[in-house]
């Protein structure tokens, strides 16, 4: 068995919190982070997280049960705070005995943290913290751990880089709280750096998206293998009247068409041929179903290929266990050379 003693020592608190061998979380990726990938990551010593996304409570119940058939190791469930059935989803997690619930996509609504921690099977709550002030508020509100995620990440992103957020937050919070760092991590060297800064662990998504165990379409994986860091771009907002939530994804015909669509709708607005609400809905609904088209159907030209800037380090399909072993070895080598 490989000796990762230096990395293990720095990860000890995070691994204990997660109940896993390594304090390496897999970021929840819609359509990708399902039973196969999640169980594979937990079985390999990491910590898998089911992406609930827009699932109904019934679908989530099935997904958790199927994941539990594939692993007896701990895993988490990522819930979107704006989901209309959030509290029903929390009940599903509680009934299934899920050990950790990750709340993403906004500030947790009133009573949600209490519901997760106060059920028949109390779970630990992990939240995302985009600023130091919000981080402190979330911890006061009962969050057990925080994820600091920078703009290098794939999917929905904030405006500040991982390295800056880590420098702002870890000195203030890492000693007394469990903090994970995410966004742009593709190699163990970076992981080692954040652990030395006080992080209890890390979260990676893009690095695991093309694992052998990932159900993503072969063409989706090939698009990742071809891509460089500069191909993973944040969505562009053309007009302030038509708000666009920043999302990082691989540029393709779909992203180009989206920019044209915004310009077209803005022009119609200028000519007063459409109501503001209808115009905003057209923009909001443009990407409906686009993630599924990319991940499941393999439509890499028109679908949404959410990817972080670390995509340039993803060059081949590898088993999850090999990816985790590489990350740990790279971290250990970096720490040994200090």
Predicted regions and their residues:
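Conserved active-site-proximal phosphate/metal-binding subdomains
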Residues: 159-178, 186-338
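Acidic, glycine-rich active-site loops and adjacent beta-strand->loop/helix elements
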Residues: 151-152, 183-185
């Amino acid at each position: 068995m490989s000796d990762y003693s230096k990395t293990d020592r720095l990860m000890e608190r995070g691994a204990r919190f997660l109940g896993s061998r390594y304090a390496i979380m897999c970021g929840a990726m819609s359509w990708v982070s399902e039973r196969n990938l999640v169980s594979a990551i937990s079985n390999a010593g990491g910590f898998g997280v089911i992406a609930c996304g827009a699932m109904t409570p019934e679908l989530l119940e099935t997904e958790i049960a199927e994941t539990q058939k594939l692993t007896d190791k701990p895993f988490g469930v990522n819930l979107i705070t704006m989901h209309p059935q959030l509290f029903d989803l929390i009940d599903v997690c509680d009934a299934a005995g899920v050990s950790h619930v990750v709340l993403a996509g906004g500030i947790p609504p009133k009573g949600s943290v209490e519901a997760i921690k106060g059920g028949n099977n109390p779970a630990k709550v992990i939240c995302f913290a985009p600023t130091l002030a919000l981080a402190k508020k979330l911890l006061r509100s009962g969050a057990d751990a925080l994820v600091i995620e920078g703009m290098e990440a794939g999917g929905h992103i904030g405006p500040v880089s991982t390295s800056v957020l880590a420098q702002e937050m870890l000195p203030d919070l890492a000693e007394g709280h469990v903090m994970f760092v995410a966004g742009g991590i593709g190699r163990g060297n970076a992981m080692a750096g954040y652990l030395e800064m006080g992080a209890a662990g890390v979260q990676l998504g893009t690095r695991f998206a093309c694992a052998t165990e990932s159900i993503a379409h072969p063409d989706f994986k090939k698009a990742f293998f071809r891509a460089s860091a500069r191909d993973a771009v944040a969505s562009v907002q053309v007009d302030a009247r038509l708000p666009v939530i920043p999302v990082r994804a691989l540029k393709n015909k779909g992203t180009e068409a989206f920019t044209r669509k915004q310009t077209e709708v803005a022009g119609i607005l200028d000519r007063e041929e459409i109501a503001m609400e209808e115009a905003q809905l057209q923009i909001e609904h443009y990407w409906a179903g686009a993630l599924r088209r990319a991940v499941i159907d393999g439509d890499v030209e028109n679908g949404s290929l959410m990817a972080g800037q670390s995509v340039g380090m993803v060059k081949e399909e590898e088993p999850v266990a090999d990816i985790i072993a590489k990350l740990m070895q790279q971290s250990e080598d970096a720490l040994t050379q200090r």
